[in-house]
């Protein structure tokens, strides 16, 4: 008999993960319009502001694993999730571009932490015999959020919805997700004794070529996902560009079949 995968705990963290990414993806394609219309930002400024989020998320990730092994995991997860959620409200009160950039950096740090801690916790609560299947469903939640989140955000924007409403939709999604996350029960894991943190623990020489390849792949991906809606508007495409993200998410599911072919 297989170990049970679909438990109350698993459903709760699956819902928390989906709602977090839904809130994230709902807002992402709308932000360039918001910065241009509200702060009168030019293209260079928009790119710099949006990149602050990604850079901040990347900077915290190498330290996230160390923190999760040193301190209790669920409190760190909830703290990061709450911070990520609260920043959506912060965007609403950001009266200057400088303050918006500050919130954007904090948002990126919390996103980097909450995603790593969420991945760690879901592994902890799953039976080891069904870990691959469980992680597959967990990743599928991200793809579903990616397929409908941007479409929802762009639909609201194209329909003339106020930016406050769009931000509140992301905030509401993550608030419900935070409630789901707080219901997840985790078992106590004693802290792992580690050597003092140092730079060399984050650098794997064998991984540099693969990391560089991923970097080159991520640059056009980031440019496309951030600017495709604005570009479509500039060249006169009338159809909703939200479907672009839907089809892209469907295409990303091909990785499952690729893995099967490789094995």
Predicted regions and their residues:
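Juxtamembrane intracellular "pre-TM" segments in multi-pass secondary transporters
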Residues: 1-7, 186-213
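Helix-loop boundary and gating motifs at the non-cytosolic
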Residues: 9-47, 222-231, 235, 244
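Residue-level signature of mid-helix packing/kink "hotspots" within the transmembrane helices
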Residues: 54-62, 146-147, 249-253
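Cytoplasmic helix-loop-helix junction between adjacent transmembrane helices
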Residues: 105-141
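C-terminal membrane-cytosol helix-exit motif in multi-pass small-molecule transporters
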Residues: 171-190
């Amino acid at each position: 008999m297989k170990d049970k995968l679909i438990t109350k705990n698993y459903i709760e963290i699956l819902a928390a993960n989906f709602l977090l990414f839904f809130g994230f993806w709902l807002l992402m394609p709308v932000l360039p319009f918001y910065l241009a219309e509200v702060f009168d930002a030019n293209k260079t400024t928009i790119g710099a502001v949006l990149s602050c989020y990604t850079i901040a998320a990347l900077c915290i990730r190498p330290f996230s694993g160390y923190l999760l092994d040193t301190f209790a995991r669920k409190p760190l997860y909830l703290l990061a999730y709450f911070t990520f959620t609260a920043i959506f409200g912060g965007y609403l009160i950001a009266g200057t571009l400088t303050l918006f950039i500050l919130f954007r950096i904090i948002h990126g740090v919390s996103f980097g932490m909450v995603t790593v801690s969420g991945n760690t916790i879901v592994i902890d609560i799953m039976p080891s015999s069904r870990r691959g299947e469980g992680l597959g469903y967990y990743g599928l939640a991200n793809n579903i959020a990616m397929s409908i989140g941007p479409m929802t955000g762009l639909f609201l924007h194209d329909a003339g919805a106020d930016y406050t409403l769009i931000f509140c939709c992301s905030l509401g999604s993550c608030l419900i997700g935070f409630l789901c996350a707080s219901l997840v029960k985790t078992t106590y894991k004693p802290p792992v004794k580690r050597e003092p943190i140092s730079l060399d623990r984050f650098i794997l020489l064998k991984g540099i070529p693969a990391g560089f390849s991923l970097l080159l792949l991520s640059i056009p991906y980031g440019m496309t996902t951030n600017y495709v809606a604005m570009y479509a508007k500039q060249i006169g495409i009338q159809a909703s560009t939200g479907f672009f993200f839907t089809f892209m998410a469907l295409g990303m599911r091909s990785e499952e079949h690729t893995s099967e072919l490789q094995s």
